[in-house]
Amino acid sequence: MSEHQDQNIGLTPGDRFGRFVRRADMRETLAWAVFYTAVFVVLALFFYPKWMPAIHSTNMKAIERLMVIFTIISAPVCGFVLSIATYTFRHGTRGNTPPQDSAPMRTNRLGIAVFSAVAGVLCLIAVIYGITAMNSEALAAERNSKNALVVEVTGQQWAWSFNYPQLGVQSADLNLPVDRPVKFIVKSVDVNHSFWPVQLGVKADANDVVAVEINTTPNKIGHLDVKCAELCGLYHAYMETNGEVMAQTDFEKWVTDNGGHNA
């Protein structure tokens, strides 16, 4: 029986766990874990909102909130994994002389149980929050669908076109009134595309078989970047156009100026 095994005889799982975390290597590893976790939390709370595109809809706000919360939830697990990698990098073998073997260490069941429980709870929170957010957006879209402005979106290599059947207007640019629900009906006339008005926080595949519907409510006046998010050929990177969320009076004027009628 080794000296290390003899020292563990008669110790409770809690005692072994306490001795385990007081080891020099574990103290350093845990210190790095706390550091990395704090870095990810700071990034989520203070930098992600600045790095995200401008928010012009309830959907985009929900996406920003989801990114922040998911980053915070995953920060402890990611931080612990990175701390192990950091310790290994700092104390790994250098040169041609291998280090001496450390004292043997039996599996610490309490440590494994704590890590598994924490990771499991964090994953459960992420799943519940994600499902709740998804359902709330679906319910909001259903409530607003009756009064929604319908916009038929057509993708083709390599341009977008927009038809407003309720208003009798067609356009190469996407113009929307603020604070009015919008239903996009998306399709393609050739290869697959992906309709992505960035600041609205929605995205839909465009194909030539079935039309795809997505809903949102623009809630802030401003510029929109409309892009294709699926590789669709040689000029895919240039398949983009402009958009604008405008005041209701400005939108009505745009409709009449382009030969349409206001519903």
Predicted feature residues:
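Alpha-helical transmembrane segments
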Residues: 63-80
